[in-house]
Amino acid sequence: MSEITHRKKRLSSFKLIVLGFAGVIVLGALILMLPFSSTAGVVTPFHEALFTSTSAVCVTGLVVQDTGSYWSAFGQAIILLLIQIGGLGVVTVAAFFAMLSGRKISLMQRSTMQDAISAPKVGGIVRLTRFIVRGTFLIELIGMIVMLPTFCGNYGIKGIWMAAFHSISAFCNAGFDILGTAENKYPSLTGYIGDTTINIAVMFLIIVGGIGFLTWDDICTNKWHFKKYRMQSKVILVTTMLLIIAPAVFFFFCDFTGLPLGERILASLFQSVTPRTAGFNTADLPAMTGSSKAIMILLMLVGGSPGSTAGGMKTTTLAVLILSAFSVCRKKDDAEVCGRRIDGSAVKNAAAVAVMYFLLFFVGGIVISTAEGLPLSTCLYETASAVGTVGLTLGITPQLGVLSQLILIVLMYLGRVGGLTLIYAAISNKNQSGAKLPLEKITVG
């Protein structure tokens, strides 16, 4: 008994996060396998249930079965629950229920919560968790109410479920939709390309969910006083704005030329917002230009911001790497932004995360292309979508073999738990040594 207790204590917060996500995924897969989870009342193959559960918990949106037509109301409810748990984070949800039960949160649990939401300090973590959960449900409720008239107008009373499902899916950056039918599978939001209400509501939910819980806290605390924001919040907001506006302008001039002006603007903005880990689409993705698809791959790899419902290598990672490059060009020792120096460890972490994501994306694409005999560009789009936990696809996901599906499952999982979380969980502190090897310079560039 004492040995088991000792082992539990040895589990770091990073290992708890990694194992927590894995546990929820497996449990979700087992439930989705049950006959009453599907409309046909059949047992779903384990690899398909596992793929769907992983995609939901990792808030990705890639599917091998159409969510609207294949899964029953029970199955859809389970998927939505998995999305909500995955969006908030397994640790955050567990901590919230512990608080509801009146249990005292230990220091170790607070430390795990801190790592789970990328908080700068342990102090105030319980208050922040309450703020996150309440804010999440409030924003999702607002999104549901805004979309309610449109969906109820199209689907009657069923529109209430439609509005709730798509509001949660959008806020959690999941990209799952239940609009498909047996005759029209995998439609996403293509039927609403010109609907201003749905487009704006979904984009708002995606952006708010993707900027990070700490950024919300900063905005709510300091209101519109931008100068009072933390440096990280400033970097996140500016980077997010640039990653929306620049691609949208490019898409406007290179794609959607056959649409009326209003729809063209909406489509350009929507396809600029959604690749950053949301996965909805209003446009015909295969019909977009090759250069636009390449830009979308980059957006998918970047993803959202730390401590958010989004995946990807994060906006701050991109910003730190660019700022570091600027500091080299200006012959400065440290990267600087907003009147502050960026810690050198942040630059090293950003480089490690970026290399990890690009390797997963590239190697995964090559393996799938080889296994399936598909064009490499199409497979790279798929793996970028998986490791960035986006959910956009050029239509190949349902046709992939079991090996390729397993590769995507691994990529989705690694993309959601986060690069540094995985690295810290895998490497023991025992490997760290105070001794340093002799220094020698190496030429780069």
Question: Language-model segments: what does each one mean?
Answer:
Residues 1-445:
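Membrane-proximal intracellular helices of multi-pass ion channels
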